[in-house]
Amino acid sequence: MHYEVDVTIPRPLDEQTTRFLESVCRSANRVSRFHGDDAGIRLTVEVSGMCREDAIRSAVREIAGIFPGRTDGRYGEPKEI
């Protein structure tokens, strides 16, 4: 099954981070979109998994590769796609 998981990173979305995330979305990465403000960044990650827990674990691994040390974010409920 394929899921979308929303991940919130407690980091402001500045110009440099916006440019970085735009290039991440264009790469072979699983981040499909993002938005944010001064309070945090919300990324939508497309992942595969057999269940909700697998989807969240996959999202954690994906975000850890993009923002090392930032896996303390909040993860939304996976949605089947």
Regions found by a protein language model. Give the residues of each.
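Long, contiguous binding/interaction regions
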Residues: 1-81
